[in-house]
A protein has these predicted regions:
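Coupling/switch segment of ABC-type P-loop NTPase heads
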Residues: 153-181
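Short amphipathic alpha-helical signal-transduction/dimerization elements
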Residues: 86, 90-93, 169, 220, ...
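Accessory alpha/beta interaction modules
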Residues: 1-159, 289-301
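Short, charged alpha-helical interaction segments and adjacent helix-coil junctions
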Residues: 60-72, 172-301
Length: 301
């Protein structure tokens, strides 16, 4: 099983859209950071004598360290791996007070994309220190299956949307043969798309809408790769398949210049196309200036 795709998508969101992690941090650690809170991304590579370890994310917000790992399987060694990661992060950020060092462990959690009855709510390691004192290392385990599409939007946990299809992973084959179940799935994704349009309707959020859309399709393509009908259906509902982050490619090609007026105009056009069921035309609109000009005229924008 290719678990790299899940790591890649999660790290892409952390690196290119770190503000999406803020609502998740608020949910897990009961904080109340605003979504525009300053975020410092710390390096994910930590050098140890026996080699390098790589974490999924390490963020500094409000003077505190946060570490989130995305896990696609219920690995029983995860508690030990997490304390190893967190110890490395704490050592790298240790500060000296006279002859004494202080190490602050990050606030950490594991996001389980797949979980079962035996997946714990907390990962724990009991540490016996040299003076025989015992310290309990305990971090929360967050399970994707606990979040419906409604709770995701209610809590603004948009970071979970690309992985939403994994809630139905075991039912994909049955859906491909049962038109009623298949239509229920498509209806869910239609609601997801429309909610995204509402949540990300501002001119400054057009790029985020496109990026999330493509990541949703990327994971759905992978999960449904053996069921062409389901894979294609989700892709059509979400508006087409482009694996490269669309907004980044557009910026590289110079199609989006960043002028506020131009971005707002394009955002309005994209939203109109989505509402009219013309999502398949979005890519040509954002990549072809002539087609975009014609569409502006057609919609009177």
């Amino acid at each position: 099983m290719n678990n790299t795709i899940f790591d890649d998508v999660f790290r892409t969101m952390i690196e290119k859209m770190p503000y999406l992690a803020v609502p998740l941090i608020n949910e897990v650690f009961h904080t109340s950071y605003p979504q525009d809170v300053p975020i410092v991304q710390l390096r994910n590579e930590h050098q140890q004598e026996n080699g390098e370890i790589i974490t999924d994310s390490c963020l500094k917000i409000g003077g505190k360290l946060y570490h989130i790992e995305c896990q696609s399987v219920d690995d029983t060694t995860m508690a030990i791996r997490m304390i190893e990661y967190d110890f490395s992060i704490a050592v790298e950020n240790a500060h000296k007070q006279g002859r004494r060092y202080r190490m602050d462990f990050p606030k950490s959690c594991v996001l389980y994309l797949r979980s079962g009855n035996n997946t714990p709510d907390f990962l724990e390691v009991e540490m016996v220190l040299p003076d025989e004192n015992t310290v309990l290392y305990r971090i929360p385990a967050i399970k994707l299956e606990a979040y419906t599409k409604d709770s995701i939007f209610e809590k603004n946990l948009l970071m979970l949307l690309p992985f939403y299809i994994m809630r139905y992973e075991k039912d994909i084959h049955e859906m491909s043969e049962n038109s009623e179940l298949f239509q229920c799935l498509l209806n869910e994704y239609e609601e997801i798309r429309m909610n995204l349009v509402i949540e990300l309707s501002g001119a400054d959020k057009t790029a985020l809408y496109m990026d999330l859309n493509k990541l949703i399709i990327k994971i759905a393509d992978y999960i449904c790769q053996s069921e062409e009908v389901v894979r294609k259906g989700i892709g059509e509902v979400m508006g087409g398949k482009v694996l490269e982050l669309e907004s980044e490619r557009l910026r590289a090609e110079g199609e989006i210049r960043g002028e506020a007026k131009g971005e707002e105009r394009l955002s309005i056009l994209i939203n109109r196309l989505i509402l009219d069921g013309r999502s398949t035309e979005i890519q040509s609109v954002v990549t072809n200036a002539e087609i975009r000009k014609q569409m502006y005229k057609e919609y009177g924008i």
